[in-house]
Amino acid sequence: MNNDAMEHTLGGGILTTSGSKQRKTSKFVMGKYTLYETKDRMYIVGSNKRETMFRILEIDLTVPRGELTVLEDNVFFTRNEIMNVLASLEEATEDGLHKKITGYGLLGFIKFTCWYYLIMVTKYSQVAVIGGHGIYHIDGIDIIPITNNYKKPEKSSDEARLLNIFKDLDLTKTFYFSYTYDITNTLQTNILREKLKAVDRCDITIPCGITDYNEMFVWNNNLLSPIFACIDTVFDWFQCIIHGFIDQVNVSVLGKSIYITLIARRSHHFAGARFLKRGVNNKGHVANEVETEQIVTDMILTPFHQPGNGFFDSDRYTSFVQHRGSIPLYWTQDASNLTTKPPIRINVVDPFFSPAALHFDNLFQRYGGGTIQILNLIKTKEKTPRETKLLWEFEQCIDYLNEFLPTLKKLDYTSWDMSRASKQDGQGVIEFLEKYAVNTVTTTGIFHNGPDFASTKIQEGICRSNCIDCLDRTNAAQFVIGKRALGCQLKSLGIIDNSYLEYDSDIVNILTELFHDLGDTIALQYGGSHLVNTMETYRKINQWSSHSRDMIESIKRFYSNSFVDAQRQDAINLFLGHYSWREGFPSLWEMNTDFYLHNAYSLNMPKRSYIHWWNDYNIKSVKELINEELIATGNDVTREKIIKNVRGYPGAFDNYWNEYYLPRSVTWIRDLFAYNMNSTRRYHNALSKQDKAMSPFTSRKQSWLNNKLKMITSSKSLEKAEGRVVETTDLDRDTSPKQELELYEHYLHIISDRSQKLEEKMNSFSYSKYPIFISHESSEIPPMRKVIGEPLVDIAEDFTDVYDDDDDGDDENDEMTTEALLIAPDHVSVDEKFYEKVLNVDDYKPALDDYSAVIHIKPDNLQLYRDLCFSKDIQLDFQ
């Protein structure tokens, strides 16, 4: 059967709406909900932040037990009108109208055995702001029974037991929502959809087949399902929540704020605890599947729009997306024997790898049909085969699937034993990951918004990283890839001119903290403890106390996996709707396994082709689609189309700035989220006045590592052939010492040639022992710059650019200008004793790891350069 003719239902699409199309009203955004109760009805009064407009949702309590009836008339009320409505309800009801609770979000309804419960958000806190839209963390909830004769169930009843199991999933930890921004989709998806509205092409779906919220990441989809059959404005009233991690930091660059936002979205399809959820289910959903998005914003303008008639056209927004997930095979680990490393078993050997095919087809669908890069970090050599069992099977899977894919769409697979590399001397882990990161970001690209489709850069493809647990090793690998992507994003925004970011700089330190917090959160959700191995482990800069910390976290993880995970898995299955109570069927606590809750088998299911295993629509390039349908046809975004298709009268839109500056209350600047955000400024508090001006891109701990990484990644830098796919086989996965020496020798020859040319130009200089003073205003020589840690070749390039002769043969002005510049001004006093103490180059002995000092340059030339460095008119940062 041709897969193109099949209904594509994997991992995306509109939420289950029982045939009714949901619509979202843009008149105003509700942010406050008050629940009133009478004998026969419940009324939810929703209002905007300013409390100037209101709506009413009615719940009928007279329906038979176990049924839910929700009504809404889509009528909008002013403040005076809503007061009159409530007063009339008070008079018309015998027992009166009682105010029950006030909340700030509605999550949905759930039923166990008797009646429904309403889940309401009662407390929340802001964690990020994107385009002026607030993103919030749930801090408190309330569970409200929808009945007029509620009695607390007996402890031994199924109702009470299921209610307690439901409460075991703590919704006040790492669950997030937003009133006005779709956090279930990436920034690229959200902005491209809005641009399509501007050109009246909403028939184009990005990603393919997903037209609304991405159901894969909507954790309260089960809670919303009872309401879809009742009203068609569900998303006006109820908030979609995600489970994962969101944090935001501020990088201060010369007083300008650069926001870095990290969003991790956990899939709810095959969710669960570590040893209880491994591998893949029959629908292609893998365990511990997390999408990580890195958004970098220049906050010179807060909204997505440029001033005037712009519409989602700000070029100050960039993003980059990564993916992690368990190896897509049928495999399990039995933790019942209380061992720290249970044996790995491959339960089903599928010669056609059907679940893996579904999984990768879904990745093609969600990430624009681009190249899927697979970084497999599990062990490749073991005395007793454990992880290697999966290695062999996974490689056969990739080979089989690649056999039928078009050449340009083949899965780009790389296997590398990160655990073994970390036990060897040196920085092999960081070096390999840095080279792989360059290849990854070059292949997939980043998203950078522009005024129209033609100027917008789109990320196509995804890097999928995995180890056994997709925790420690995977998190370190994603950090290094994210670090390279961050450099590319900053370069695209015009903040820096080199996409390499130095380790131990402020911006890398704060990014390390972000990924460390993300890794800890994902590890707690899946493994029951914090990360055991962090970036400090793989960089080998751990403190003596880290070993005891690692041991404690290992013990916590072992305890959680052995005694707590089963209870947590029951709560997840109940919350997500994998289990529903039915009379006469086994109770949740009586089930020996939840395998059939996550794997639905049916004899009537259509079979996918084992050869043409992908959907042709999913592998179609988003860039090609936009170019064919919009740019080539002359239907790109213009001001006139924006005004015609999306700009209504100004009063039709609620001012989302009300989220930022709360109306009807005094707002202190010190209480604003942006004021209290984590920032690189905190690194300056304990430093001297001179160090406070240090760039956030300058390393605070100079090491040979930054020099070496610049060297080994420069040949594959992102500046070359943007969008070109670099084959993974070109990477030096296991660079031998001989190859490394040859690499250094090659670069040393280049530097030596340039230094020899520099020496020839400088030999004719005559200068005294006094420093040379050069005035920027009168000199044609540009200010020199030297960042600590750059290779010496950069110094030679800067110096040669200044003193190189032009090819036109005109040397007259060169001699006159050079001689004039070497004369110190009469009015400048020089401390001769100070300069007599300057380091003697003849006595200088380079350290073993100082690669830049191996070059042979005459001492007098180096002394001249040092004299230039100590000039008071030229401020250099040189050691």
UniProtKB/Swiss-Prot annotation:
Question: Keyword Cell membrane on this protein?
Answer: no
The alphabetized UniProt keywords are: Hydrolase, Membrane, Phosphoprotein, Vacuole
Q: What is its EC number?
A: 3.1.3.-
- Pfam name, any one: Syja_N
Q: Which EC main class describes this enzyme? A: hydrolase
What does the annotation give as the result of altering residue 59 to T? Defective activation of FAB1
A cellular component term from Gene Ontology for this protein is: nuclear periphery
Q: Phosphoprotein among the record's keywords? A: yes
Name positions with the PTM Phosphoserine: 829
SAC domain ranges (all copies): 166-528
Q: Name one GO molecular function term.
A: phosphatidylinositol-3,5-bisphosphate 5-phosphatase activity
- Cofactor needs: Mg(2+)
What protein name is recorded for this chain?
Polyphosphoinositide phosphatase
Q: Name the species this protein comes from.
A: Saccharomyces cerevisiae (strain ATCC 204508 / S288c) (Baker's yeast)
Q: What is the lineage of its organism?
A: Eukaryota, Fungi, Dikarya, Ascomycota, Saccharomycotina
